[in-house]
């Protein structure tokens, strides 16, 4: 019997192993490159123009906008919780720049969604509401506010007002889409009227699907006869009865208009300085270790 029949595999096996190793290295290198290039936004100072795909009215002063990412296979590149800066140039050549938090899933491919309320005198919101399909808006980012990790806390409370719901919704959505994240969430959300409650259907759907994990309480200043939520402001008495209490196992996230910050948590000193906790939360024993202001 020829010895070649036994020696041949000893030559081939290292070759096959080497080829397999090269293939695996190439495969994972390709995935790494793909994961990097599949994000429209990668940070830095580059402004990227996105085309408006469609938009529709949510209420008399609020619209839902869907923009196309650079590629149908792209994700936005955002993480929870983060936002994008937006920019447009006025007729006088002045830059108007504002931050907006998307309401779409951070893993959504091809498009990115925003819900934007038009404010009297609001230059950017007025600009958005004047857009037509095919128009472009400049964006850059992402700007990471709070990098969420599953099960960081046993429980959290989200306190929001008006359009301040968007980062809170982003956080709520991220927690509840992950079956491994057991964080308990309470959302307290205030508005002027029932019509002003943004993304209420999406919020109610989450609360319905995650009854053992999520509770939502709505507040309105001006309630109709059929209103079933709370009337008035989010106040000390309510928070004292419903917050998880200051501890290392819980966190309170706040986002809303200046009046809400002033009354409940105190305002931020700057985008990078949370400042001290004041107002109702301070009276209840919360410090800046227990509270995050978007």
From Swiss-Prot:
GO term, biological process aspect, one: ergosterol biosynthetic process
Reactions this protein catalyses: 2 Fe(III)-[cytochrome b5] + NADH = 2 Fe(II)-[cytochrome b5] + NAD(+) + H(+)
InterPro entries: CBR-like, Cbr1-like_FAD-bd_dom, FAD-bd_FR_type, Flavoprot_Pyr_Nucl_cyt_Rdtase, FNR_nucleotide-bd, OxRdtase_FAD/NAD-bd, Riboflavin_synthase-like_b-brl
Gene Ontology, cellular component aspect: mitochondrial outer membrane
UniProt-listed Enzyme Commission number(s): 1.6.2.2
Chief place where the protein resides: mitochondrion
Keywords, sorted A to Z: FAD, Flavoprotein, Membrane, Mitochondrion, Mitochondrion outer membrane, NAD, Oxidoreductase, Transmembrane, Transmembrane helix
CDD domains: cyt_b5_reduct_like (cd06183)
A single GO molecular function term of this UniProt record: cytochrome-b5 reductase activity, acting on NAD(P)H
Keyword Transmembrane set for record: yes
Role, per record: May mediate the reduction of outer membrane cytochrome b5.
Membership in a protein family: Belongs to the flavoprotein pyridine nucleotide cytochrome reductase family.
Annotated PANTHER family: NADH-CYTOCHROME B5 REDUCTASE (PTHR19370), NADH-CYTOCHROME B5 REDUCTASE 2 (PTHR19370:SF171)
Name of the protein described by the UniProt record: NADH-cytochrome b5 reductase 2
Organism from which the protein derives: Meyerozyma guilliermondii (strain ATCC 6260 / CBS 566 / DSM 6381 / JCM 1539 / NBRC 10279 / NRRL Y-324) (Yeast)
UniProt gene name: MCR1
């Amino acid at each position: 019997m020829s010895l070649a029949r036994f020696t041949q595999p000893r030559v081939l096996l290292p070759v096959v192993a080497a080829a397999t190793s090269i293939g695996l290295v190439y495969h994972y290198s390709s995935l790494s490159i793909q994961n990097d290039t599949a994000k429209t936004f990668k940070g830095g100072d580059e402004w990227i123009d996105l085309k408006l795909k469609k938009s529709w009215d949510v209420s008399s002063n609020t619209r839902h906008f869907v923009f196309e990412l650079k590629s149908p296979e792209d994700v936005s590149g955002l993480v929870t919780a983060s936002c994008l800066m937006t920019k447009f140039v006025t007729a006088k050549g002045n830059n108007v720049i504002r931050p907006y938090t998307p309401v779409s899933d951070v893993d959504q491919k091809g498009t990115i969604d925003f819900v934007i309320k038009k404010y009297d005198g609001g230059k950017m919101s007025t600009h958005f509401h004047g857009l037509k399909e095919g128009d472009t808006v400049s964006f850059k980012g992402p700007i990471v506010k709070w990098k969420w990790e599953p099960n960081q806390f046993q429980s959290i409370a989200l306190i929001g007002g008006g359009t301040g719901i968007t980062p809170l919704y982003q956080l709520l959505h991220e927690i509840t889409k992950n079956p491994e994240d057991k964080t308990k969430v309470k959302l307290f959300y205030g508005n002027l009227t029932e019509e002003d409650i943004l993304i209420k259907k999406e919020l109610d759907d989450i609360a319905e699907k995650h009854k053992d994990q999520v509770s939502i309480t709505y507040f309105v200043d001006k309630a109709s006869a059929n209103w079933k939520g709370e009337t008035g402001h989010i106040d000390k008495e309510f928070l004292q009865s419903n917050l998880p209490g200051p501890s290392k196992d819980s966190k309170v996230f706040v986002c809303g208009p200046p009046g809400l910050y002033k009354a409940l948590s105190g305002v931020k000193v700057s985008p990078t300085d949370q400042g001290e906790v004041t107002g109702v939360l301070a009276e209840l024993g919360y410090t800046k270790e227990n509270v995050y202001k978007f």
